Swiss-Prot record:
Disulfide bonds: none annotated. Transmembrane segments: none annotated. The lineage of its organism: Eukaryota, Fungi, Dikarya, Ascomycota, Saccharomycotina. Residues 129-315 form the CP-type G domain. SUPFAM superfamilies: P-loop containing nucleoside triphosphate hydrolases. It comes from Zygosaccharomyces rouxii (strain ATCC 2623 / CBS 732 / NBRC 1130 / NCYC 568 / NRRL Y-229). This is Genetic interactor of prohibitins 3, mitochondrial. Keywords: Mitochondrion, Transit peptide. GO terms for cellular component: mitochondrion. One of its GO terms (molecular function) is GTP binding.
């Protein structure tokens, strides 16, 4: 019926203008119902600029006579409608485009999203307790964790809470896997065995997706019940996932009154005529700035309701990366769409030699990697930014301190603030011994792969000097674990587990004093301290560590690998 009215209106300009006004009134009534910021979910108010939720109320434009029938057609079906301008008479298509209304957002979000200006104090952190208090007992939870940084952001306790039905949902899969089959099939088998053998959790409720490439979105939707809550750390991809699900299954944002009753009507045929503008109004606010979401926001997709919650922060008093890393570098690491997926296929490496003088490799000063003397190594970095070698760490810090402006010839290599570039601002992380390749993960930044080439010979331990406040872990290459483990499991018809069960595959680093010389001895001492309450996890307890690392083992020994879940 409504579709026929649109088509008939094109034959009569007067009717067309009438339909145009109806179309515009829908936007006005929709905006009248919106009492929350479309980006962060906070309640809006336009009375006190110094109070949370302040926004500048837009003034309604005045619509005059349109100049042509083509203008009206374009209005109704345009895929590129623009923002509102205040108090502007509309008499042409160009002016009409400029008056189309956008969802209301608070001034904080507007400045952050459109001007890249924000005060960290306005982006408060939430504990996991703060977030869980917003969820009714017995609810279905999807614990959202970015796959490329796993197991960072993973909270084991969420899968063990008895009064929630929790599934593990791994996002940003395109930053680790080359194809969607790894996410759809292989990862499901691997993580089922990983949870069982590494953590002692029996669960087959794991889904891996890529919201950016729409990989395996159907499995994520299938994992959702009538009411599902997305729970995860800040900036792990919850909003991007919601938007992908809404696009695929035609969802929309829901609003509630003060009594908690839904006041949003289902979209009509008219609403969906301009699908691009429709989704622009409905989408969850996606930002590279952590802690953008401040309140629960609901969405209806098919017959299911999905709730986006503020991201929690494990270390509520942790460092702010904005105080360490330059804004443009930080934006590159946080924006998912800026990740270069070609690196996953080409895997072009850089060779780095270790020497007695302390030759090192860095990406922006975000880390300095110092390989053992006498080794030749390959590194593939998936962290945005150009890498560079220096004679030693002190030389690298000296250069970056001098990079005060873009005029410096090496400015493009510097990603940290010059005032950070003092030795005392960096922490010495030592990697436990390994065979073959490993991946080093920097929390909320990215990961890179390193491999020592040539015949195996232990020549020392790899060191990473990282700014204080950035967490680091080491793992066996995750994509290889998933693919090879899944293959062995399939070939053995399920007799061989898809995940190793007799060795740890993830480990924390060992933070030692800058002057410590007996690294292996100190590592053993720290290993015993870490495992004092987890004695069953201890391995090679009575073996000579030098004897263990001196020979090549058929299976990785992963000496002193340990991660506290």
């Amino acid at each position: 019926m409504l579709k026929e009215q649109f088509l008939n209106a094109f034959d009569h300009p007067s009717r067309c203008l009438f339909m145009t006004l109806r179309f515009r009134r829908w936007f006005s009534t929709t905006l009248a119902r919106l009492i929350n910021c479309n980006s962060c979910g906070i309640k809006l108010q336009n009375e006190n600029p110094k109070t949370i939720g302040y926004y500048i109320k837009p003034k309604k434009p005045t619509v005059n006579k349109l100049q042509s029938l083509e203008d009206v057609k374009y209005l109704l079906f345009s895929q590129d409608l623009q923002h509102v301008k205040e108090q502007q008479d509309v008499g042409s298509l160009e002016e009409l485009n400029e008056t189309m209304e956008s969802p209301l957002i608070c001034k904080r979000c507007n400045d952050a999203l459109h001007r890249n200006q924000y005060d960290l104090k306005e982006f408060g952190r939430y504990t996991i307790t703060d977030v869980l208090e917003k969820i009714p007992r017995g609810s279905n939870i999807l614990h959202v964790v970015p796959l490329p940084e796993f197991p960072f952001h993973f909270e084991k306790s969420l899968l063990e809470v008895p009064h929630f039905n929790t599934s593990l949902l791994l996002t940003k899969g395109d930053q680790l896997a080359n194809d969607k089959n790894t996410l759809q099939r292989r990862s499901l088998v691997f993580f089922k065995d990983f949870l069982k053998y590494q953590l002692g959790i029996i669960s087959n409720k794991t889904v891996a997706v890529s919201g950016l490439k729409n990989w395996n979105i159907q499995s994520a939707y299938a994992a959702m019940n009538a009411n599902s809550y997305l729970v995860g750390d800040a900036n792990v991809g919850k909003s991007t996932l919601i938007n992908s699900v809404m696009q695929r299954y035609l969802g929309y944002k829901i609003h509630t009154d003060r009594k908690g009753q839904i006041v949003t009507n289902e979209p009509s045929v008219k609403d969906l005529k301009n699908i691009k503008h429709f989704f622009k109004n409905q989408f969850a606010g996606v930002s590279h700035i952590p802690n953008m979401t401040r309140n629960l926001q609901g969405y209806r997709v098919g017959d299911k309701f999905i709730y986006d919650l503020p991201g929690f922060t494990t270390n509520i008093n942790g460092a702010y990366y904005e105080d360490i890393i330059q804004k443009d570098w930080l934006e590159r690491t946080r924006k998912t769409e800026k990740f270069n997926t070609k690196k996953l296929k080409k895997q072009r490496y850089i060779s780095v030699k270790g020497n007695e003088k302390g030759n090192c490799y860095t990406v922006g000063g975000i880390f300095f990697w110092q390989p053992p003397a006498g080794t030749v190594n390959q590194v593939v970095s998936y962290i945005p930014g150009e890498g560079r070698e220096f004679a030693d760490i002190n030389r690298g810090l000296e250069v970056f301190r001098a990079c005060q402006d873009d005029a410096h010839p090496l400015a493009k290599f510097c990603g940290v603030h010059p005032q950070i570039c003092q030795r005392e601002n960096y922490v010495r992380h030592v990697i436990p011994p390994f065979q073959g390749s490993i991946e080093v993960v920097l929390k909320d930044i990215g990961y890179f792969t390193i491999k020592t080439t040539g015949r195996y010979q232990f020549k020392g331990l790899h060191e990473f000097w990282v700014p204080r406040g950035i967490d680091v872990l080491v793992r066996e290459p995750l994509e290889s674990l998933i693919s090879e483990g899944s293959w062995r499991h399939t070939e053995s018809k399920g007799r061989v587990p898809a995940c190793p069960k007799d060795r740890p595959i993830v480990s924390s680093t060992y933070i030692v004093d800058p002057e410590e010389s007996d690294l292996l001895g100190k590592m053993k001492e720290m290993y015993l301290e870490r495992t004092s309450n987890d004695i069953s996890s201890r391995r090679f307890l009575y073996d000579d560590p030098l004897e263990v690392v001196s020979k090549l083992h058929e299976e990785r020994p992963n000496l002193y690998w340990y991660y506290r879940w």
